[in-house]
A protein has these predicted regions:
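RNA-interacting cores
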Residues: 1-141
Length: 141
């Protein structure tokens, strides 16, 4: 993992945990022999948008994009979300603690704002503590 010097650390957590992480400001963390200095923190609300994107959603369907999309649609409907478009990206793998983790990116579009907030709160699929299945507003041109 190569991070530019000005990369911002973003933590998504409930409001009641803000005080817990504020003690990190000004500290330096050692990650794989490299020092990372933690700056000041800012509170930011979840995005009000109709298009959300997750860079990494765990894909346990093998190399079958259609099966992944079918699973994603089923999971989204299980959350009672309303949407019109779902697009999957290329499959990629990264090292997990026990075995490689296969993922795909996923875009969910044309959602009501309240459903988009719910998806940002809930996420999709396993390994969310590793950052998988977390959705952010998609930047459009």
């Amino acid at each position: 993992l190569y991070l530019p010097r000005r990369t911002k650390l973003t933590l998504r957590l409930p409001r009641e945990r803000l005080q817990d992480v504020s003690v990190l400001s000004g500290l330096s963390l050692q990650v794989n022999g490299h020092s990372i200095k933690i700056g000041g923190c800012k509170q930011r609300l979840l995005g009000l948008t109709t298009v959300l994107y997750s860079r990494y959603v765990v894909d346990s369907t093998g190399d079958d994009e259609d099966a992944f999309l079918a699973w994603a649609v089923w999971e989204l409907k299980a959350l009672r979300l309303r949407f019109k478009k779902v697009l999957a990206g290329k499959r990629c793998e990264f090292a997990g603690t026990d075995a490689p983790v296969a993922t795909r990116s996923l875009l969910v579009a044309d959602m009501p704002h309240e459903d988009a907030v719910l998806l940002q709160q809930q996420g999709l699929g396993p390994k969310r503590a590793m950052g998988c299945g977390l959705f952010v507003p998609h930047k459009t041109i």
